[in-house]
Design a protein with these regions (language model features):
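Conserved beta-strand segments of the P-loop GTPase G domain that flank and frequently precede/overlap
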Residues: 15, 43-44, 150, 195-199, ...
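A conserved catalytic-core segment of Leloir-type glycosyltransferases
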Residues: 64-105
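Pre-Walker A (Motif I) flank of P-loop NTPase domains
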Residues: 7-12
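Phosphate/Mg2+-binding loops and adjacent switch elements
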Residues: 98-210
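Switch/connector loops and helix/strand junctions flanking conserved nucleotide-binding motifs
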Residues: 49-54, 86-90, 155-160, 205-206, ...
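C-terminal lobe/tail of nucleotide-utilizing enzymes
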Residues: 1-6, 188, 192, 202-329
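Walker A/P-loop NTP-binding active-site region of P-loop NTPases
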Residues: 15-81, 161-164
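Conserved catalytic network of the ASCE P-loop NTPase/AAA+ motor domain
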Residues: 6, 33-36, 70-74, 137-142, ...
Length: 329
């Protein structure tokens, strides 16, 4: 089992709007699943080397490499998938043609094939993840308890995963089509869960909702929603109501400052504090409204806090700990 919420899932696909922190959440998820001596593999497919930056390590090659040890002795490995190398892998795995593939690369055919046909590129990238899932069936192979794929953003996630549909214009039959069908057999199964990362802002939430509907339309398995960078609420409902009604005045804040013996110009400070309080209240109302829209999806939700010190390896450990506390096991 990889988690109590998704007991049959071997492949966790993580997507999100740009800037929502999907790579951070993918890395923390890999850490959370690498518990009690388990091994997870964290994969990226966009060529950004975001994983290497998070783990403060050298750029990842097209080779599985350990990047962290999880609490309890688990391990997190990482892999940056290159479409050209994945095509060479495909030629070698199914046709024993790696040497021929190397010759094709020299002629520029490999680059041409992976650039001119985006459907082929996606089936190669997703195919590598699915090959690693199926590797568990091979005796003696290095296997993982869970694979976490840092996938493209929400605007492209359904097309990226719907490899048979996107490849239909390129190949209706033949080996590439059979390979796509094999890949789809993993992606559309209970072995896979697609998780979405969002912020409590209107556009990221709308993209998340649209992505969930699109994934459902393609019968792709949706996992949970990770609400990232959540700020602590400074006011309770009663205090929010007082701010909204204008009941809290500058004079009241001045009295509080003087009672607390805060030095400086009390009235000027009170005006600034009250303005900031109204801004925070506005932000809280926005976040509450967007959170309600996420709740309406009826999916498991994980609220991840904004880290005051930024995201580093220590921050990943903290996010992983919070994920486990919220039900990921």
């Amino acid at each position: 089992m990889t988690s109590a919420l998704w007991p049959d899932v071997a492949l966790h696909v993580v997507s999100g709007k740009g800037g929502a922190g999907k790579t951070t959440i993918a890395a923390a998820l890999a850490m959370a699943l690498a518990r009690e001596g388990r091994r997870t593999l964290l994969m990226e497919v966009e060529g950004r080397q975001g994983i290497a930056q998070l783990f403060d390590t050298a750029p990842l090659p097209y080779q599985e490499r350990r990047v962290a040890v999880a609490p309890g002795g688990g391990e997190v490995w990482a892999l940056a998938v290159d479409p050209q190398e994945a095509l060479l892998d495909y030629l070698n795995l199914y046709y024993n043609l790696r040497s021929a593939g190397a010759a094709l690369r020299k002629l520029g055919a490999i680059d041409f094939a992976t650039t001119i046909a985006p459907g082929l590129r996606d089936v190669l990238l997703t195919g590598k993840a699915c090959e690693l899932v199926r590797r568990a069936e091979k005796p003696g192979a290095q296997t993982y308890d869970a694979i976490v794929l840092d996938a493209p953003p929400t605007g492209r996630i359904a097309k990226f995963l719907n490899v048979t549909g996107e490849l239909s214009g390129l190949a209706h039959s033949g080996p590439i089509r059979r390979h796509a069908d094999l890949v789809m057999g993993v992606i559309a199964s209970r072995q896979t869960a697609v998780h979405l990362v969002t912020l409590l802002e209107e556009m990221p939430v709308q993209e998340t909702i649209d992505a969930v509907h699109e994934l459902h339309d393609h019968r792709l398995p949706v996992g949970g929603v990770f609400v990232n960078m959540v700020r602590p609420a400074l006011f309770d409902p009663y205090q929010l109501e007082r701010l909204d009604s204008g009941e809290v005045s500058v004079d009241e804040v001045v009295e509080s400052l003087r009672a607390a013996r805060v030095p400086g110009r009390a009235k000027q400070t009170a005006a600034i504090l009250l303005e900031e309080a109204h801004e925070h209240a506005r932000r809280m109302r926005l976040e509450n409204r967007e959170r309600a829209r996420i709740d309406d999806l009826g999916l498991p939700i994980f609220a991840m806090p904004m880290l005051a010190e930024g995201v580093d390896l220590g921050g990943l450990y903290e996010l992983a700990r919070l994920m486990r506390e919220e039900g990921l096991r």
